[in-house]
Amino acid sequence: MERKHIITISGKPGSGKSSTADKVAELLGYTRYSSGDMVRNILAREHMTLAEYNEKANDDHALDTKIDEYLRGLRTKKDVIIDSRLGFYWLPESFKVYLDLDMQVATVRIYKDAVSNNMRTKSGEVASSLDAVSKQVRERMENERRRFKEMYNVDPYNIEHFDLVIDTSRHTPQTVALTVYDHYRQWLKTDTWKQVRSSIPLGYSFKNQY
């Protein structure tokens, strides 16, 4: 069976999905797509915060449906990286990557990002203290679990859906991207694949030269 040259990257908030997707796309020479970018464009156009978007999406699924249609349209593409919460669901034939991390690490990353990025602070994407950020992240995850369970009967945070699970808590996007690259090249060469839960060694680099 010929593998699709598509990688979908999902994971927890703060796990480095966008940064990793950018670097994997660069390594492979692939085109990157992001549902997160689409959401941010909607927020800017509608003058909404992320919190307002999530609240509205609980009752109005039109926004989610628009993003899902966009993702389904990417199935005809090749040589692409897709950073999306439900990419694995809409493109099940892709190499499905999940980026995990400790929630305390996620909280600190998101808080630091907010402090250094005034635009995102104004958007309401994050709150003003570590405790508030932690609460917001957990509420966001539970909201998405509930919403997507209702819409598609799928939990986007269930790691059993994925081919490769990486804990990014202690590693840079570059290191994580190299790990994705390495396993993806192995995945392309085989018809069968058992989920890999990767604990990246410190100082990781390419295992093989391609």
Cite the ranges covered by each PLM segment.
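Small-molecule kinase domains that catalyze NTP-dependent phosphoryl transfer to phosphate-bearing small molecules
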Residues: T121-V176, W193, R197-Y210
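ATP-dependent small-molecule kinase phosphotransfer cores
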Residues: S35-P92, Q104, K112-E125, D131, ...
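Hydrophobic anchor at the beta1->P-loop junction of P-loop NTPases
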Residues: I9
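Post-Walker A helix-loop "phosphate-sensing" segment adjacent to the P-loop in P-loop NTPases
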Residues: E26-Y33
